[in-house]
Amino acid sequence: MSLFLKDDSIQIREVWNDNLESEMALIREVVDDFPFVAMDTEFPGIVCRPVGTFKTNTEYHYETLKTNVNILKMIQLGLTFSDEKGNLPTCGTDNKYCIWQFNFREFDLESDIYATDSIELLRQSGIDFVKNNEFGIDSKRFAELLMSSGIVLNENVHWVTFHSGYDFGYLLKLLTCQNLPETQTGFFEMISVYFPRVYDIKHLMKFCNSLHGGLNKLAELLDVERVGICHQAGSDSLLTSCTFRKLQENFFIGSMEKYSGVLYGLGVENGQIVH
């Protein structure tokens, strides 16, 4: 499969409450053969910053992440599965490559706190908050199905992300039905249990001739084209998947195991792991 995908070769499978179980059944079928899972979430932005004295930058960043994730709700989750060569699974009668976009119901514009600019961006990107409230997935039900899906708690699954502290924060909160751990150490202990192999592209970029910038900029530099709409989780997860593969081809030889387990902006101070 070429990394230069076209819109008409991809099916973004929209998942709502009424088709959640059937789509999760499909995912259970593909994960063994396509164990690289690129992930992105959409959430209501960052609404508060902690005050006080912090020993390290990463301690401050984690406190910010924890505070926001604990009071906010995930809106969308995108998952793109691929094999070690970057091939995507095909589904349905038309044999299109499949990626998944999960729409959640809990976030309520009328009663929940949010960052106005973030919500406006998501609205402009086509997210229908009223539809999500009415037809979206119940997150507790999703968590139960995710736990038995084979994609978490599995050392054979490689999670691929971009600057993903918040993404994993929301997933951990969803999976455990609890607020995030008080400390970074506790957070990374949970990451290592639920997501044993994690690659954060933003961290990997440090080892690639000083590449910098966001996901869209990196994809542009590597000639990876977006399929779908920016700031929707399905499209962003696909761009993450393709960009990771291109980065690996261009800059890394052999196993990437030593780069696993580090999330950009968390857990590392002056090159030393502090969690």
Curated annotation (Swiss-Prot):
Provide GO CC annotations from the record. CCR4-NOT complex; cytoplasm; nucleus
Q: Where is the signal peptide?
A: none
Q: InterPro entries this protein is in? A: CNOT7/CNOT8/Pop2, RNase_CAF1, RNaseH-like_sf, RNaseH_sf
The free-text function statement in the UniProt record for this protein reads: Ubiquitous transcription factor required for a diverse set of processes. It is a component of the CCR4 complex involved in the control of gene expression.
The cross-references to Gene3D superfamilies, in alphabetical order and at most eight, read:
Ribonuclease H-like superfamily/Ribonuclease H
| Name of the molecule in the record | Probable CCR4-associated factor 1 homolog 7
Cystine connections:
none
Q: Name one GO molecular function term.
A: poly(A)-specific ribonuclease activity
Cofactors:
a divalent metal cation
**Which reactions appear under catalytic activity for this entry?**
Exonucleolytic cleavage of poly(A) to 5'-AMP
| Binding sites annotated in the UniProt record for a divalent metal cation | D40, E42, D167, D236
Q: Which UniProt keywords apply?
A: Cytoplasm, Exonuclease, Hydrolase, Metal-binding, Nuclease, Nucleus, RNA-binding, Transcription, Transcription regulation
